[in-house]
Amino acid sequence: MFLVKMVLGFLIFLSPLCATGLDISQTDIIERSLNFLLFAGILWYFLAKKLRSFLHSKSLEISKRLEEIQAQLKVSKENKKKLLKELEQAKEKAELIISDANKEAYTITQKYELQTKMDVENLIKNSKALMDLEVKKIKRELVESVFKDLRESKKVSFNVQDCVNILKQRL
C-alpha cells in the first residue's frame, strides 16, 4: 500500500514535466526514478518489520508507563480520601473532647459554687449561733453581776421566790 502511494506520488511529481514540450530523451530520469523506487521498496521490505516492532515496543512501553502512573494516581487519590476521612474524624473527636471539657468545667464550676454557697450559709448559721451564744453569755453574766451586786448591797432585799423568778427570766 505504501509502495503504491509512493509510485502515485512520484507520477504526480513527474506530470508537470510530461506536460511541457521538453525532449527528455537525453535524460535518465526514468531510470533514476525506477532505481529510487526499487531502493525504497527493498529498504521498506527489510526494515518494515523491525520498524513496526520497534514502534510497537515503544507504544507498549508508553502504555505500560501510563498504566503505572494511573495506578500511582489512583493510590494517591485513595490515600488522599483516607487522610481526609481521618482528618474529619479527628475534627469530630476534637469537637467532642472540647464539648465534654466545657460540660465538665461547667459541672465543676456548679459544684464548687454550690459547695461555696453551702459553706457560706453554714458560716453564717454558725456565726449567728455563736453570736446568739455570746449574747446569751453576756446577758447571763450581766444578770449575774447585777444580781450579785444587788444581793451584796444591802439596799434591796430579795426573798427566795424573787430570786427564782429572776433566775428563770435570766435563762
From Swiss-Prot:
TM annotation in the entry: 2-22
Gene3D superfamilies: F1F0 ATP synthase subunit B, membrane domain
Keywords noted in UniProt: ATP synthesis, Cell inner membrane, Cell membrane, CF(0), Hydrogen ion transport, Ion transport, Membrane, Transmembrane, Transmembrane helix, Transport
SUPFAM superfamilies noted in UniProt: F1F0 ATP synthase subunit B, membrane domain
MF-aspect GO terms: proton-transporting ATP synthase activity, rotational mechanism
InterPro entries: ATP_synth_B-like_membr_sf (IPR028987), ATP_synth_b/b'su_bac/chlpt (IPR002146)
Domain of life: Bacteria
Function: F(1)F(0) ATP synthase produces ATP from ADP in the presence of a proton or sodium gradient. F-type ATPases consist of two structural domains, F(1) containing the extramembraneous catalytic core and F(0) containing the membrane proton channel, linked together by a central stalk and a peripheral stalk. During catalysis, ATP synthesis in the catalytic domain of F(1) is coupled via a rotary mechanism of the central stalk subunits to proton translocation.
Homology family: Belongs to the ATPase B chain family.
Self-association and partners: F-type ATPases have 2 components, F(1) - the catalytic core - and F(0) - the membrane proton channel. F(1) has five subunits: alpha(3), beta(3), gamma(1), delta(1), epsilon(1). F(0) has three main subunits: a(1), b(2) and c(10-14). The alpha and beta chains form an alternating ring which encloses part of the gamma chain. F(1) is attached to F(0) by a central stalk formed by the gamma and epsilon chains, while a peripheral stalk is formed by the delta and b chains.
Name the record gives this protein: ATP synthase subunit b
